[in-house]
Amino acid sequence: GLFGKILGVGKKVLCGLSGMC
């Protein structure tokens, strides 16, 4: 649902910022 989509985007942002992808 919407919450899952927001969580997914948040994880992508954190992954990109931290460089731990």
From Swiss-Prot:
InterPro entries in alphabetical order: Nigrocin
ATP-binding is among the record's keywords: no
Tissue: Expressed by the skin glands.
Keyword Transport: no
Gene Ontology cellular component terms for the protein in this record: extracellular region
Major place of residence: secreted
UniProt-annotated location(s): Secreted
Keyword line: Antibiotic, Antimicrobial, Cytolysis, Fungicide, Hemolysis, Secreted
GO biological process, one term: defense response to Gram-negative bacterium
Protein family: Belongs to the frog skin active peptide (FSAP) family. Brevinin subfamily.
Function statement: Antimicrobial peptide active against the Gram-positive bacterium S.aureus (MIC=12.5 uM) and against the Gram-negative bacteria E.coli (MIC=3 uM). Has antifungal activity against C.albicans (MIC=50 uM). Has some hemolytic activity against human erythrocytes (LC(50)=40 uM).
Name the record gives this protein: Nigrocin-2GRb
